[in-house]
């Protein structure tokens, strides 16, 4: 059965020749960029040369790519030329963020733990209410300050927490510095496990070129409420764990009980935030299937807060009656 087309859908899918030209033009530009990036002196080659270095060293070695943005100007010019030739072409630049009118951007390069991205903070974006701390290092060049004020946020993280001993109950509060003017051309250096920032008062769109290094770590991503300065949420920091988190949520929304083994497997992952997220989603999807893993988690999970959460959730399960009724299904508020 054909899918009805939106009146806003003007993509020329019925023009086979034009669609072929679009695909060929995009593929040609992608191949050109890949060739330039992997050649000696190219961006990928520069990243690969420091792949085994500590994050601070990686940042230092790649800073020239922030200082001289001629390569970025050329790349955006080629992307615009592709769009000028056909507005339905999609330049080979992966978008990130931008939902609900918030900040978004384009990923310019990503190799292992290293990412270089162009970020836009719209002038009309809502005032930030949370500060997010993502383990790693970052260097951020301000391409257009647009009159914005910068507020830096800081939180203390101990060596034990970085090594895998983080608990929400012992998390330090967040502290914010007084706002200051953001300046065109300045470069911010952040230990993003402990430092974050927010922007306010911009008179136009703020444009940032951001270099981040986020190697695998047991320390989770932490979101703090700026009003109370208290920890509001934790989530998996490792990218594969983050992708699995999103995939499990999607499977639960799709109502796929046949995928329960994937959820059960994730409840034994190394990342405690992923383990508990998978458990919650499995309970919402298939409570009976979740019960054996929840029982094991309540007694043997290596993280104390996951054990306590599992024990509290286990107490919500109805006790089976002597006849066995009520032992197979139950309703739990998610």
Predicted regions and their residues:
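Amphipathic alpha-helical scaffolding segments comprising HEAT/armadillo-like alpha-solenoid repeats
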Residues: 225-232, 256-267, 288-299, 320-331
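Conserved short histidine dyad/triad with adjacent acidic residue
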Residues: 114-135, 181-183, 190-193
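Short acidic-glycine-tyrosine-enriched beta hairpin
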Residues: 140, 155-196
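A short hydrophobic beta-strand segment most commonly corresponding to one strand
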Residues: 139-141, 187, 202-221
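Alpha-solenoid helical repeat architecture
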Residues: 235-236, 251, 266-270, 298-302
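A short, N-terminal "cap"/entry segment at the start of jelly-roll beta-barrel domains
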Residues: 2, 10-114, 226
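Short, conserved beta-strand element in jelly-roll/cupin
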Residues: 135-155
């Amino acid at each position: 059965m054909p899918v009805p087309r939106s009146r806003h859908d003007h993509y020329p899918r019925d023009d086979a020749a034009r669609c072929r030209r679009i695909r060929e033009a995009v593929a040609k530009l992608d191949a050109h960029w890949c060739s330039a990036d992997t050649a000696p002196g190219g961006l990928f080659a520069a990243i690969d040369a420091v792949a085994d270095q500590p994050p601070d060293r990686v940042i230092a070695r790649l800073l020239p790519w922030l200082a001289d943005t001629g390569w970025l100007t050329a790349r955006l010019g080629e992307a615009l030329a592709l769009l000028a030739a056909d507005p339905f072409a999609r330049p080979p630049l992966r978008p990130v963020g931008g939902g609900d009118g918030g900040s978004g951007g384009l990923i310019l390069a990503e190799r292992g733990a290293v990412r270089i991205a162009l970020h836009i903070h719209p002038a009309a974006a809502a005032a930030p209410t949370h500060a997010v701390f993502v383990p790693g290092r970052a260097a951020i060049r301000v391409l257009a300050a647009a009159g914005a004020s910068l507020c830096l946020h800081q939180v203390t993280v101990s060596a034990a927490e970085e090594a895998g001993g983080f608990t929400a109950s012992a998390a330090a509060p967040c502290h914010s510095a007084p706002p200051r003017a953001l300046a065109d051309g300045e470069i911010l250096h952040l230990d993003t496990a402990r430092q974050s920032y927010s922007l306010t008062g911009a008179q136009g769109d703020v444009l940032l070129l951001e270099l981040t290094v986020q190697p695998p770590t047991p320390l989770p991503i932490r979101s703090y409420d700026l009003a109370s300065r208290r920890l509001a949420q934790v989530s998996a920091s490792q990218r594969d764990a983050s992708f699995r988190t999103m995939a499990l949520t999607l499977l639960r929304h799709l109502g796929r009980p046949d995928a329960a083994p994937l959820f059960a497997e994730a409840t034994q992952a190394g990342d405690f935030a992923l383990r508990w997220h998978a458990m919650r989603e499995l309970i919402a999807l298939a409570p009976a299937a979740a019960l054996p893993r929840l029982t094991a988690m309540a007694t043997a999970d290596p993280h104390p807060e996951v054990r306590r959460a599992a024990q509290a959730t286990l107490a919500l399960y109805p006790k089976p009656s002597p006849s066995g009724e009520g032992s197979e299904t139950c309703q739990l508020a998610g």
